[in-house]
């Protein structure tokens, strides 16, 4: 009887050891596999960080993949938005027009002598008469596709002001992630004011992502903003650069370009985009460069490099899955 009991104990002990070895082996294989294939967010963070670390300035980046996975690099800092805030302006204006029942096709007569001939303004070059007659939709198209400063200043002055814009955007993204305090005209008069129109990379990415994935304002007006951003003509050497020759890629984006100070430092060089790939992956990419010790072309190369790496990694992920 005693011998049988000892035999059972030995058999049970051997069985437990075998189970332990099996579990340990499976766990080790799983850990090895995870180590060999780290999460996409980790790979993106590491790859972007390597590019950012070599920059003679500060770069902040945010990526939102499929409205879910989020990557942040240098997001604790805030960056001058420059003309990126024209997306914020468009949303606030359209929301105000929704509430008041005003059409974007409302005609506006603009006295040419009230416009700034020295600022960036394709609109001013397109119309030579003393009075320019355009719809609000036309003005928005000028600001979103060509970053027209006169059109932006006019809408801030006569339609929806800076404070109203700032307040509305605070209902869409965290208050701490951005601030809009000045117009293009005010920043032109005092370049330091550009730093008071700021955003975190994630704040800008969140707004662009919500614009393309959620209903924020009237459907027709929101569709107009989205489609117009797909026609953006500025900054094609930034996020769009490595994507222009890629079949089936759709990009909507808005750029922002800063001033160069007396020391040759570029205050800001930005781009925020929503990108759809042919493999059903969509992502928002926000890249903000500030206090860059180099020229605009060099700053664009950093933005384009980050865009190329993100695109490549997301395409590889798609192939593997």
From Swiss-Prot:
Substrate binds at residues 233-235. It catalyses: a beta-lactam + H2O = a substituted beta-amino acid. It is an enzyme of class 3 (hydrolase). GO terms for biological process: beta-lactam antibiotic catabolic process; response to antibiotic. It comes from the Bacteria. The active site is at 83 (acyl-ester intermediate). Its EC number is 3.5.2.6. Inhibited by clavulanic acid. Residues 1-30 form the signal peptide. It holds the Pfam family Beta-lactamase2. PROSITE patterns: BETA_LACTAMASE_A. One of its GO terms (molecular function) is beta-lactamase activity. Keywords: Antibiotic resistance, Hydrolase, Signal. Can hydrolyze cephalosporins, penicillins and also cefoxitin; but at a slow rate. Belongs to the class-A beta-lactamase family. The class A beta-lactamase family has a specific amino-acid numbering system, sometimes called Ambler or ABL numbering and often misspelt as Amber. A multiple sequence alignment was used to derive a consensus sequence and then the consensus was numbered taking into account insertions and deletions. This allows use of identical numbers, e.g. for active site residues, despite differences in protein length. UniProt always uses natural numbering of residues, hence there appear to be differences in numbering between this entry and some papers. This is Beta-lactamase. It comes from Phocaeicola vulgatus (Bacteroides vulgatus).
């Amino acid at each position: 009887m005693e011998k049988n009991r000892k035999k059972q104990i030995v058999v049970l002990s051997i069985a437990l050891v075998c189970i332990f070895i099996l579990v340990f082996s499976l766990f080790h294989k799983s850990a090895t596999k995870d180590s060999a294939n780290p999460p996409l967010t980790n790979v993106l963070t590491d790859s972007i960080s390597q590019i950012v670390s070599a920059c003679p300035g500060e770069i902040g980046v945010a990526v939102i993949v499929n409205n879910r996975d989020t990557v942040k690099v240098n997001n604790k800092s805030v960056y001058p938005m420059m003309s990126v805030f024209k997306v914020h302006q468009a949303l606030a204006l359209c929301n105000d027009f929704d509430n008041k029942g005003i059409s974007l096709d409302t005609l506006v007569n603009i006295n040419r002598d009230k416009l700034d001939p020295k600022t960036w303004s394709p609109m001013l070059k397109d119309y030579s008469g003393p009075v320019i007659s355009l719809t609000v939709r036309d003005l928005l198209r000028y600001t979103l596709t060509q970053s027209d400063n006169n059109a932006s200043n006019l809408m801030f002055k006569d339609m929806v002001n800076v404070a109203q814009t700032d307040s509305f955007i605070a209902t869409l993204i965290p208050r701490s992630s951005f601030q809009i305090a000045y117009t293009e005209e005010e920043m032109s008069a005092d370049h330091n004011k550009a730093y008071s129109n700021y955003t975190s990379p994630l704040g800008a990415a969140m707004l662009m992502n919500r614009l393309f994935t959620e209903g924020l304002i009237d459907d027709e007006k929101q569709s107009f903003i989205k489609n117009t951003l797909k026609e953006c003509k500025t900054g094609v050497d930034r996020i769009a650069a490595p994507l222009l020759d890629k079949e089936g890629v759709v990009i909507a984006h808005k750029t922002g370009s800063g001033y160069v100070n007396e020391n040759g430092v570029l205050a800001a060089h930005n781009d925020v985009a929503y990108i759809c790939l042919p493999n059903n992956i969509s992502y928002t990419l926000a890249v903000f460069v500030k206090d860059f010790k180099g020229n605009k072309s060099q700053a664009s190369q950093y933005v384009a490099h980050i865009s190329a790496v993100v695109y490549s990694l997301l395409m590889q992920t798609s192939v593997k899955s």
